[in-house]
Curated annotation (Swiss-Prot):
One Gene Ontology term from the biological process aspect of the record: dolichol-linked oligosaccharide biosynthetic process
Organism name: Debaryomyces hansenii (strain ATCC 36239 / CBS 767 / BCRC 21394 / JCM 1990 / NBRC 0083 / IGC 2968)
Keyword Nucleus carried by entry: yes
Localization, UniProt: Endoplasmic reticulum membrane; Nucleus membrane
Protein encoded by which gene: ALG14
Subunit structure and binding partners: Heterodimer with ALG13 to form a functional enzyme.
Protein name as catalogued: UDP-N-acetylglucosamine transferase subunit ALG14
Upper taxonomic lineage: Eukaryota, Fungi, Dikarya, Ascomycota, Saccharomycotina
Length: 232
């Protein structure tokens, strides 16, 4: 075999893994496969619970106003038929109390159970960029560790920010890419975001199966966004 033929074979073998990875990424990436929704797909809040089908739902509570919005949204969703995994950030004892109160007041005891995970916070308010990089790495490690310890991966990941939700969402997406889970990622943008998405929303938008906004102009601007009115 001459030199040119050997070189061509080596180049093909070198590029083949990248080609396969690219095809796989296109196959699983919702931003490529999901149709644009836009503001014309308004079907009402009742359409949201239709996605919550599966044996386990993981709910991320982002602390402060994010937790408050999520709990008000969940007031319209019946979670009795699902195992529930509540995820909070380190130092956020208030969110833990709120989800436990939700469990006590709204959910009936039975065969479905609830678990609680505490992840290292990706970034604190006022933290420098350099410090936040290390915090994000610690958050990634913490997230991988806790997900590895789960008896099963969630069927649904429901989140609405802020920063700590990004490592969680991307690790779940990586597991989907590797074929280890089929988790559907649903992100609900904060009511405070009227004209622009949050940084967390922009980062998570490409990998979400559903991206829900609460202002119509956002659904017009971002074609994969779904609009059902104000949810809280």
């Amino acid at each position: 075999m001459d030199f040119e033929s050997q070189l061509c074979i080596k180049v093909v073998l070198l590029l083949l893994p990248f080609f396969i990875i690219g095809i796989r990424l296109l196959w699983v990436l919702p931003a490529v496969n999901s149709p644009a929704m836009g503001s014309e797909k308004e079907k009402g809040l009742s359409q949201i619970p239709s996605e919550l089908r599966g044996s386990n739902i993981m709910i991320f509570l982002g602390s402060g106003g994010h937790t408050g919005e999520m709990m008000r949204i969940l007031a319209n969703v019946d979670l009795n038929n699902f195992n529930r995994t509540w995820v909070t950030s380190s130092g956020d004892s208030t969110s833990i109390l709120k989800c436990k109160k939700y469990e006590d007041e709204r959910l009936t005891s039975g065969q479905n159970k609830s678990d609680y995970l505490v992840l290292h916070r990706a970034r604190t308010v006022g933290e420098s960029i350099i410090s936040s990089v290390f915090s994000t790495v610690r958050s990634l490690i913490s997230t991988i560790k806790h997900l590895y310890e789960l008896p099963q991966f969630p069927s649904i990941l429901l989140l609405n920010g802020p920063g700590t939700s990004v490592p969680l969402a991307y690790i779940i997406f990586l597991l989907k890419f590797l074929g280890l889970c089929k988790t559907r990622i649903i992100y609900i943008e904060s009511l405070a975001r009227v004209k622009q998405l949050s940084v967390s929303g922009l980062l998570i938008l490409p990998i979400t199966d559903r991206f829900i906004v609460q202002w119509k102009q956002l659904a017009v601007k971002y074609k994969r966004a779904e609009y059902y009115g104000i949810l809280i």
